[in-house]
Amino acid sequence: IDVNRRVSEIASLDAVAPHLLPGNTVRYLMPSRYCPSDEFQSFVSAEFGKFSGGERIAAIRDWIHDKIEYVSGSSTGQTTALDTVVQRQGICRDFAHVLICLARASAIPARFASVYAPDVTPQDFHAVAEVFLDGAWHLVDATGMAGADSIARIGVGLDAAEVAFL
């Protein structure tokens, strides 16, 4: 697989003002089955209020990586982002859901991406988030297992309920 993607440093990217967002991105601001972003607005303001745009996404990514432990088998098909934050453990799907949730609570469109990530050991399918910054979608892996430059995107949706996770 050859991946040809321009990868930008997330922290250097600007958010797009909600009223200037392309119409097809607006749905990715809404709460969804696994990402109850409306329940995180106070938390996001308190924890990440001094950041905006890509700096906020980088801070969220780092917070998730530092505060949530990757534990195989620690979640089920019913685990939401809220469950993951409370339990402080999850798998790649859960890490993606938390990042999506916190981005949406920040008025930054975010979606779930099912991907193939050759850097993941053992090699397997993987789940990451995509955020809409500077007028384009950018892959963000809060687990730190895969770089955006090597990820092959398979499918995207509001959350795992819309995307086959292989």
Language model features with spans:
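Solvent-exposed residues in well-ordered beta-strands and their adjoining turns
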Residues: 2-6, 132
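Short, charged, solvent-exposed linker or helix-capping segments at domain edges/interfaces
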Residues: 8-15, 141
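Secondary-structure boundary elements
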Residues: 3, 11-12, 18-90, 98, ...
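Hydrophobic/aromatic-rich core segments of domains that either
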Residues: 62, 94-166
